[in-house]
Amino acid sequence: MLKVGSSLLAADGGGLSPRFALGLAQFVSANLAAGRELVIVSSGAVAAGRAILPKAVDVGAPIAARQALAALGQAQLIALWQRFFERAVAQVLLTHDDLRNRRRYLNARATLGELLRLGALPVINENDTVSVDELKLGDNDNLAAIVAALVDADALFIATDIDGLYSADPRSNPLARPLDDVPELTPEVLAMAGGSGSNVGTGGMRTKLEAAAKAGAAGIETYLFNGRSGEVVRALAQDRLRGTRIHAARTRIAARKYWLRHAPVEAGAILVDAGAAMALSDKGASLLPGGVVGAEGDFRRGDMVEIRLRDDEGERCLARGVSQYSAVDIRRIARRHSRDIENVLGYSYGENVVHRDDLVLL
């Protein structure tokens, strides 16, 4: 899995440049020639669209305007990658809903698997044109990590505009030292991350480490390298790392539990009391309506939500899971016994608000 940011494809702040992408394309070609399967997650649609209509919008423009630029630029982005390879390049556009909904998530996995079986090169991007959440900081870094787990990748390579992770921001601190090997992403390591310094893309080093943590939970190592350096990319194509290796977690979680933990969450939460929190964390129980005190947001049945403990100290997130009932229904059955659900609602989807098989503790 290779993730490429827009700052590497439009490094002069203008449109996409084959010159900037050439080294990365050679890295891809070397891996394909070695018989490896590869998937690319590539940003750059907004930057390409901005070059088509340079006076249309600034970097900090409203989401709707940037989405329009993405619509203009996505074809340019795919054309850029297609020109480097003799094999077919497949465009795959995903949204948070595709990753949050279990059925669509599995459909995406099946499609990507078939593309790889056919010998195609999938190039993935968020569907910027319709996805409101897409244009948040670092989204494609996290997308790359989730897709890496989706296709059961061996490794995640994240091309950035510096030489990897440093002990401090090397642009502002001359004493910053490079870290070539990170056995574990501790809070101290995360604190070392600074911004990328680029005004072309939206991802900083912090989001790249968050992506590495997500990939690591699926047993996937992450490599951060300087995608602008021809020497670094050529070395990488020969399996010689010049950058930062971030080890995978020691314990790999099951595929379904991974999805529950890392899929984008619906803007909503189920609020529970201390007794329910103890049953979830200590006994591995399902969440029953009797321990529910309320619901936040307007989520629907089948949506991924957070499960939060509400007590005198406030709220804190305990778990994530797939709700069997909508927020409206949960407010009506909160504090009720499971046997009362049908009497209150006029129907029942079962005794559990969230079944333990559809729940993961955080």
From Swiss-Prot:
<protein>
    <recommendedName>
        <fullName>Glutamate 5-kinase</fullName>
        <ecNumber>2.7.2.11</ecNumber>
    </recommendedName>
</protein>
<keyword id="KW-0641">Proline biosynthesis</keyword>
<comment type="similarity">
    <text>Belongs to the glutamate 5-kinase family.</text>
</comment>
<keyword id="KW-0418">Kinase</keyword>
<dbReference type="InterPro" id="IPR041739">
    <property type="entry name" value="G5K_ProB"/>
</dbReference>
<feature type="binding site">
    <location>
        <position position="3"/>
    </location>
    <ligand>
        <name>ATP</name>
    </ligand>
</feature>
<dbReference type="InterPro" id="IPR019797">
    <property type="entry name" value="Glutamate_5-kinase_CS"/>
</dbReference>
<dbReference type="InterPro" id="IPR002478">
    <property type="entry name" value="PUA"/>
</dbReference>
<feature type="binding site">
    <location>
        <position position="128"/>
    </location>
    <ligand>
        <name>substrate</name>
    </ligand>
</feature>
<dbReference type="Pfam" id="PF01472">
    <property type="entry name" value="PUA"/>
</dbReference>
<dbReference type="Pfam" id="PF00696">
    <property type="entry name" value="AA_kinase"/>
</dbReference>
<comment type="function">
    <text>Catalyzes the transfer of a phosphate group to glutamate to form L-glutamate 5-phosphate.</text>
</comment>
<keyword id="KW-0067">ATP-binding</keyword>
<feature type="domain" description="PUA">
    <location>
        <begin position="267"/>
        <end position="348"/>
    </location>
</feature>
<dbReference type="GO" id="GO:0005829">
    <property type="term" value="C:cytosol"/>
</dbReference>
<feature type="binding site">
    <location>
        <position position="43"/>
    </location>
    <ligand>
        <name>substrate</name>
    </ligand>
</feature>
<dbReference type="GO" id="GO:0004349">
    <property type="term" value="F:glutamate 5-kinase activity"/>
</dbReference>
<dbReference type="InterPro" id="IPR036974">
    <property type="entry name" value="PUA_sf"/>
</dbReference>
<dbReference type="GO" id="GO:0005524">
    <property type="term" value="F:ATP binding"/>
</dbReference>
<dbReference type="GO" id="GO:0003723">
    <property type="term" value="F:RNA binding"/>
</dbReference>
<keyword id="KW-0963">Cytoplasm</keyword>
<dbReference type="InterPro" id="IPR001048">
    <property type="entry name" value="Asp/Glu/Uridylate_kinase"/>
</dbReference>
<keyword id="KW-0808">Transferase</keyword>
<keyword id="KW-0028">Amino-acid biosynthesis</keyword>
<feature type="binding site">
    <location>
        <begin position="202"/>
        <end position="208"/>
    </location>
    <ligand>
        <name>ATP</name>
    </ligand>
</feature>
<feature type="binding site">
    <location>
        <position position="140"/>
    </location>
    <ligand>
        <name>substrate</name>
    </ligand>
</feature>
<comment type="pathway">
    <text>Amino-acid biosynthesis; L-proline biosynthesis; L-glutamate 5-semialdehyde from L-glutamate: step 1/2.</text>
</comment>
<dbReference type="InterPro" id="IPR005715">
    <property type="entry name" value="Glu_5kinase/COase_Synthase"/>
</dbReference>
<keyword id="KW-0547">Nucleotide-binding</keyword>
<dbReference type="GO" id="GO:0055129">
    <property type="term" value="P:L-proline biosynthetic process"/>
</dbReference>
<dbReference type="InterPro" id="IPR011529">
    <property type="entry name" value="Glu_5kinase"/>
</dbReference>
<dbReference type="InterPro" id="IPR015947">
    <property type="entry name" value="PUA-like_sf"/>
</dbReference>
<dbReference type="InterPro" id="IPR036393">
    <property type="entry name" value="AceGlu_kinase-like_sf"/>
</dbReference>
<dbReference type="InterPro" id="IPR001057">
    <property type="entry name" value="Glu/AcGlu_kinase"/>
</dbReference>
<feature type="binding site">
    <location>
        <begin position="160"/>
        <end position="161"/>
    </location>
    <ligand>
        <name>ATP</name>
    </ligand>
</feature>
